[in-house]
Curated annotation (Swiss-Prot):
Official protein name in the record: Maturase K
InterPro entries to which the protein is assigned, alphabetical: Domain_X, Maturase_MatK, Maturase_MatK_N
Domain of life: Eukaryota
Alphabetized UniProt keyword annotations: Chloroplast, mRNA processing, Plastid, RNA-binding, tRNA processing
KW tRNA processing (keyword) present: yes
Entry GO terms, CC: chloroplast
Name of the gene: matK
Function (record text): Usually encoded in the trnK tRNA gene intron. Probably assists in splicing its own and other chloroplast group II introns.
Length: 506
């Protein structure tokens, strides 16, 4: 692993940070072929063989530059052969090699100094899934308005390439990238949000994820710059957000009039702070201030996408709602803020008063309908939520079948333990439990009732409901009654690093 990194640093220093020559290095494709997506980039090349030969890669790139091979019909795109080689296989090798070429130098450049390394470490902590759960608990109950928006996808690959071009300065690399993208990839399947992630997972083309993440990073850097600047403006300066026409000649008169006649209205803008949360392509803007400020930021985002990134976004796709009126969907939860009215009796001498207090409570609800739809797609139940057997697992041993179902149930229960209402989660566990029983009965060629009767009891499958509760009771067995009540409520687990596969139902 260290040898690859040394070679790469030497190549970059010799070429003065030009990336195109790295495409023709043999070890790059060794890294790409032996790369484990869940592990480090520098992995051992256990499976490295002639399938990732540099000679074949050079031949493919040469054929790409030939004019008569720039246009390939859709019918031949999956079965076309290059001198006896499968084109899809080697297009994936080139793509993986290109992704490593652009990812590793970027990481080396960003970690070149200790100060930059600390900045990167700081932002990595902020941009993890762990920072979103405390935001739910600590901030949402004090905010009034939320804007639910999805970052629009680029309508053309050239937009992604141009955004990446701001960082690198290698013209041959971009020329090769354009040829590769247009000849080997069908972008029409990628611009649809519902097909984007599934297409990426099937093709395993990391270069697309890299370019898209670069696009999102560029957008967020501009947005956060504007947000930080606006939050540091003084009260008199920020008042111009009511109407831009007062910014120049009429600013003094404007401030004087508002300070005299509309001081109560102006006080809403004393804290022009916007909370921004994003996970994957879904973003949330939340604010404590009036809806006028949220509408301003909505227009800023639309104009930023249209004029800077050439991405069209309909204004109606960004909706602004009050927390108490409508919930929003993020990270597999439906979240809203419920208002609880309580009356407190206060007595002073002979007079008694009833004081109404409004308490805000955050509710995170498990979306049962999308989850049942995901379970039905995975063949654990039908579309109505009735459990069915899993025939493809019937050939496994009883232990493997139970272990697979328990693993899925444990993951869902682990992730959704942050919900304020567990009833929907118990229903999902019930579906998985009966599906497991029906799968075991199908394997033993018996009915469910006969299978359970032969076992004598249902204790074999009680782990679906008792395992997690038993673990938590052991953790808090010596704690006070207050702590024992806490673990029965909402818990955000800190070992969650990504959203569960079954939760990606959109």
């Amino acid at each position: 692993m260290e040898e690859y990194q040394v070679y790469l640093e030497l190549d970059i220093s010799r070429q003065q940070h030009f990336l195109y020559p790295l495409i023709f290095r043999e070890y790059i494709y060794g890294l790409a072929y032996g790369h484990d997506f869940n592990g480090s980039i520098f992995s051992e090349n256990v499976d490295y063989d002639n399938k990732s030969s540099l000679l074949i890669v050079k031949r493919l790139i040469t054929r790409m530059y030939q004019q008569n091979h720039l246009i390939i019909s859709a019918n031949d795109s999956k079965k076309n052969q290059f001198w006896g080689y499968n084109k899809n296989l080697y297009s994936q090798i080139i793509s993986e090699g290109f992704a490593i070429v652009v990812e590793i130098p970027l990481s080396l450049q960003l970690n070149s100094s200790s100060e930059e390394a600390e900045i990167i470490k700081y932002y990595k902590n902020l941009r993890s899934i762990h920072s979103i759960f405390p935001f739910f608990e600590d901030k949402l109950t004090y905010l009034n308005y939320v804007s639910d928006a999805r970052i629009p996808y680029p309508i053309h690959l050239e937009i992604l390439v141009q955004v990446f071009r701001y960082w690198a300065k290698d013209a041959p690399l971009f020329h090769l990238l354009r040829l590769f993208l247009y000849e080997y990839c069908n972008w029409n399947n990628l611009i649809t949000p519902k097909k984007l992630i599934s297409t990426f997972s099937k093709s395993n083309l990391r270069v697309f994820l890299f370019l898209y993440n670069f696009y999102v990073c560029e957008y967020e850097s501009i947005f956060l710059f504007l947000r930080n600047k606006s939050s540091h403006l003084q009260l008199t300066s920020f008042s111009v957000l009511f109407e831009r026409i007062y910014f120049y000649g009429k600013i003094e008169h404007f401030v004087e009039v508002f300070a005299k006649d509309f001081s109560s209205t102006l006080s809403f803008f004393k804290e022009p702070f916007i909370h921004y949360v994003r996970y994957q392509g879904k973003s949330i803007l939340a604010s404590k201030n009036a809806s006028l400020l949220m509408n301003k930021w909505k227009n800023y985002l639309i104009h930023l996408w249209q004029y800077h990134f050439d991405v069209w976004s309909q204004p109606r796709t960004i909706q602004i709602n009050q927390f108490s009126e409508r919930s929003f969907h993020l990270l597999g939860y439906f979240s809203n803020v419920r208002l609880n009215l309580s009356a407190v009796r206060s007595q002073m001498l002979e007079n008694a008063f009833l004081i109404e207090i409004v308490m805000k409570k955050l509710e995170t609800i498990v979306p049962i309908i999308p989850l049942i739809r995901s379970l039905a797609k995975a063949k654990f139940c039908n579309v109505l939520g009735h459990p069915i057997s899993k025939p493809v697992w019937a050939d496994s041993s009883d232990f493997d079948i139970i272990d697979r179902f328990l693993r899925i149930c444990r993951n869902l229960s682990h992730y959704y333990n942050g919900s304020s209402k567990k009833k929907s989660l118990y229903r999902v566990k019930y579906i998985l439990r009966l599906s497991c029983i029906k799968t075991l009965a199908r394997k033993h060629k018996s009915t469910v009732r006969a299978f359970l009767k032969r076992l004598g009891s249902e204790k074999l499958l009680e782990e679906f409901f008792t395992e997690e509760e038993e673990i938590l009771s052991l953790v808090f067995q010596r704690a006070s009654s207050t702590l024992q009540g806490l673990y029965r409520g909402r818990i955000w687990y800190l070992d969650i690093i990504f959203i569960n596969d079954l939760i990606n139902h959109e």
